[in-house]
A protein has these predicted regions:
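Glycoside hydrolase catalytic-domain context in secreted enzymes
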Residues: 1-749
Length: 749
């Protein structure tokens, strides 16, 4: 046994037992029994079952759940709003300190805000969503402050910090940094699919779990395992692709890597992070590619009846892991109305409100025992305007908020994402007591409490929730993890074209470029657009390499005339799928989502939409047949064509950030080489372009022949699109890729 004290945290390491740690200021005492030490979290002076680390997590959680009041259980079923550390004035996530802004308060950046104290103490919240942090050390100190505060409160229930994916490399610079980063940088989800190697996703998960735990995070709101069979969906890049077998392999590798602590019999321990797989029953089939964050995109459709395939990443992977933790800890249903799927009740409602999808399938047929947590913001009253970014209580808008909560709870939902007020849940309990009886409702609430507590026990937080900030600073963004991430970035890059037409002597294609060349890189121009929250954004101009071209590669010049080569950075086309102007002019508001740059008129769209019907609309047909839309970033195409004209017989290299499949025929023939990447750093792209890495990535998607092919494919069917064949005869189908020597061998399952 070893006793230590550092920064006001007492810690006892026990041979043959669990290490326990507690804060001096929390008032917690230590109990000794049978030669072991335990924390007296309830401050009763006796060892209660939930305090006894010798018992199973299930036994401990059941004991504690039975001791909690309904108000305390309701608090466990909540999730805090997004928390930034510190919350800066003018940012999206505000906070005050003794009524003052952070900058006015003079507080340390890791101080607990007024709002955080309130939801810990008054609302009994123990699940907190972390966003931006000033540094790993500050995050660790803030986590410790939260855990100290929680330890002083009844039963000493620790905080379960969670995070959306935070290791994306897209905004990284043009030079790789081997260490000292804020966190290791990796490809986006579909980039892992482009590696065609599940071990890459597994390595990410192992490294990220260590970084998460060093930041205080014990739940990952991911992976996003929707089969993205609809190419226009705005969340395509976050998924693990559309091919079900690869998605299953990646899901297992990701969840096992995140949840498993090596050396623990059941897999759970100090390195474990709970995974919350999303989005049940699959959110990748939105009609015409629209997204259900918005009411105009609420419907998921299954034109070929392929619903069952979309369940497989959950039912055949996340729920049956290869590692010792066995199953993903939690599931998040999507906002969507899975249109026409519920044949039993005939109800088209948001997934969390669907008895068929949650109670009958998820809890019943597939026997999922973990947490079901709704997506963020589904219980409040809806926005008056259909394009508003508000509550998504699709199909149950006539209910009260408490009635919506009760419906979700009776279906099998345990937690409400984005809800930080316990009142509606307590009211739901009261309504349920009248409807089902107090005994039945108490048992149902305790069941959710038990599920939620098990995940906190799994991660060892009841014994030791405290971090060493100095150690956290060493772990997060360390050299080893950054190197792993950078290798994964390079491995995910796909070389689509490498023409021999302007290749240097001795090379089969124009890539790799020789170093020391003069390089022209045009600025990108993006027109007026809509932000994620549906806010209007003005037109802008941006430099793809704001820090300049690293001198080891060559010299950046101001014009094509001076250059030896042009390097054109583009992003896949993006557009606005809904127009209030169209609505005001007598239309229905719906526009085609275009995957091409030039104006697109939908001549082959459905005459009548599959799904429709909203209380804010006096029609059900959401068709956009005959309407035209244009990409915000149409000027990306102009850059390519202008460079081709200006460069004459000198090479033009296109580097495309692929957020969605894209129509290539507009520019492919004008490019000597095309490099596709899925959310990686400029440094990784330049490494491939200049010979630092011979590409190995393959397309995890299909590139469409044209927009007619996009309209003709089915939202629910994978790999069913007519694909583009380029000017050199290469088919941009799933699994296609090149290296410097030529086309990679054909992909086989």
């Amino acid at each position: 046994m070893e006793k230590t004290t550092k920064n006001g945290i007492h810690r006892i390491s026990q041979e043959g037992g669990k290490t326990i740690a507690w804060a001096e200021e929390s008032g917690v005492k230590v109990l000794e029994k049978d030669g072991y030490y335990f924390k007296d979290l309830a401050k009763t002076g006796e060892l209660l079952p939930y305090e006894d680390w010798r018992l199973s997590d299930e036994e401990r959680a059941a004991d504690l759940a039975g001791r909690l009041s309904i108000e305390e259980i309701a608090g466990l079923m909540l999730y805090s709003p997004h928390q930034a550390v510190p919350p800066m004035p003018g940012g999206p996530f505000q906070g005050t300190f003794d009524g003052k802004t952070y900058l006015e308060s003079g507080k340390e950046p890791y101080a607990i805000s007024d709002q955080q104290k309130e939801f810990l103490e008054d609302e009994h919240i123990r699940h907190i969503l972390l966003t931006n942090v000033e540094s790993p050390e500050i995050s660790a100190k803030w986590s410790n402050e939260l855990q100290k505060r929680a330890e002083t409160l009844p039963y000493g229930i620790p905080i379960n910090l969670s995070s959306d994916p935070r290791n994306g490399a897209k905004d990284s610079g043009a030079e790789f940094k081997s260490g000292g980063s804020e966190i290791s940088k990796w490809p986006e989800g579909v980039g892992f699919a482009a590696c065609f190697d599940p071990e890459v996703a597994g390595q990410f998960a192992k490294d990220a779990s260590r970084e998460y735990r060093a930041l205080g995070i014990t739940t990952a709101l991911g992976p996003q395992i929707d089969l993205c069979t609809e190419p226009r969906w705005m969340r395509f890049v976050d998924t693990l692709g559309e091919e079900v077998e690869m998605s299953k392999k990646l899901t297992k590798a990701y969840c096992d890597g995140m949840q498993t602590t090596e050396g623990e019999a059941d897999g759970w321990g100090k390195d474990s992070v709970n995974t919350m797989v999303k989005h049940w029953p699959g959110g990748g089939t939105g009609e015409a590619g629209r997204d259900a964050h918005y009411a105009f995109g609420q419907f998921a459709v299954y034109p070929t009846g392929n619903f069952e395939e979309h369940l497989k990443p959950f039912t055949e992977a996340a729920f049956h892991l290869d590692g010792p933790t066995d199953c993903a800890s939690a599931v998040m249903p999507y906002y969507t109305v899975s249109y026409g799927v519920d044949k039993k009740n005939g109800k088209n409602v948001g997934n969390s409100y669907s008895e068929y999808l949650i109670k009958d399938l998820l809890r019943g047929k597939y026997e999922f025992k973990g947490i079901v947590c709704t997506d963020w913001g589904i219980t409040q009253d809806p926005e008056k305007m259909i394009e508003g970014f508000g509550s998504r209580c699709y199909g149950v808008q006539d209910m009260t908020e408490a009635e919506r909560c009760l419906l979700a709870i009776t279906n099998g939902v345990d937690q409400f994402g984005g809800n930080s007020e316990s009142g509606p849940i307590v009211e739901a309990y009261k309504i349920g007591c009248e409807k089902y009886g107090e005994k039945a409702m108490r048992e149902r609430m305790e069941l959710s409490a038990k599920r939620l507590l098990i995940n906190i026990f799994h991660c060892g937080l009841f014994e030791d929730p405290y971090l060493d900030p100095e150690e956290s600073a060493k772990i997060v963004g360390c050299e080893e993890f950054c190197r792993h991430g950078y290798e994964a970035q390079k491995k995910s890059i796909v070389l689509l074209k490498n023409s021999a037409k302007r290749a240097p002597e001795g090379q089969k294609g124009v890539l790799p470029l020789k170093k020391g060349l003069k390089v022209y890189i045009p600025e990108r121009k993006i027109g007026p657009s809509k932000a994620f929250f549906r806010i209007d954004l003005p037109a802008k101009t941006e430099d793809p390499l704001p820090d300049g071209l690293p001198s080891k590669y060559g010299t950046r010049v101001a014009s094509p005339e001076e250059a030896d080569v042009a390097l054109v950075f583009i992003e896949s086309p993006a557009c606005n799928p809904y127009s209030t102007e169209d609505l005001a002019n007598g239309g229905n508001g719906y526009l085609p989502i275009t995957l091409q740059y030039r104006p697109y008129t939908a001549k082959k769209a459905r005459e009548v939409s599959i799904a429709g019907g909203d209380f804010r609309e006096n029609f059900t047909n959401r068709s956009y047949l005959g309407k035209t839309n244009t990409a915000y970033n149409e000027a990306d195409l102009d850059n390519i064509l202008e460079c081709r004209r200006a460069m004459g017989d000198k090479p033009v290299i296109v580097c495309a950030t692929v957020n969605n499949p894209m129509v290539m025929h507009e520019f492919e023939a004008e490019a000597d080489a095309i490099v596709a990447e899925f959310g990686v750093s400029r440094a990784a792209v330049l490494d491939v372009v200049f010979g630092g890495y011979n590409p190995t990535g393959r397309l995890p998607i299909q590139m469409p022949k044209d927009m007619d092919a996009v309209e003709e494919q089915s939202e629910d069917r994978a790999l069913d699109m007519e694909t583009y064949i380029d000017s050199e005869g290469h088919n941009y189908d799933y699994g296609y890729g090149m290296n410097y020597e030529g086309v990679l061998p054909a992909w086989k399952k």
